[in-house]
């Protein structure tokens, strides 16, 4: 997910992926929670879903071989983590990019 350094933002250090691959064959990137802004929406968790594809592709570039996404047909109506959910209709295109 990342580390919390304040400012209601999570920071992801992709350099950790190759290190983890030295001790385990599988590294799964939590792409949607990584764009969360804990407490960043006035008392609830905010997020930046537009960065989910970039997070996934960056993780792939660093060697991740699995990806986790929270998806919803209408993310803004999601009961939890709405601000960082990937719209369901965007998932297929992203998965195809990750398969290349």
Question: Which sequence ranges carry the predicted segments?
Answer:
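Catalytic alpha/beta core domains of metabolic enzymes, predominantly
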Residues: 1-71
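C-terminal helical cap(s) of enzyme catalytic domains, especially alpha/beta-barrels
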Residues: 74-100
């Amino acid at each position: 997910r990342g580390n919390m350094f304040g400012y209601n933002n999570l920071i992801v250090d992709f350099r950790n992926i190759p290190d983890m691959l030295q001790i385990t064959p599988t590294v799964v990137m939590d792409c949607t929670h990584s764009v969360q802004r804990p407490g960043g929406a006035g008392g609830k968790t905010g997020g930046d879903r537009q960065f989910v594809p970039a997070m996934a592709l960056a993780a792939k570039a660093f060697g991740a071989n699995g990806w986790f996404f929270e998806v919803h047909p209408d993310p803004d109506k999601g009961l939890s983590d709405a601000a960082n959910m990937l719209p369901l209709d965007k998932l297929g295109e992203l998965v195809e990019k990750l398969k290349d």
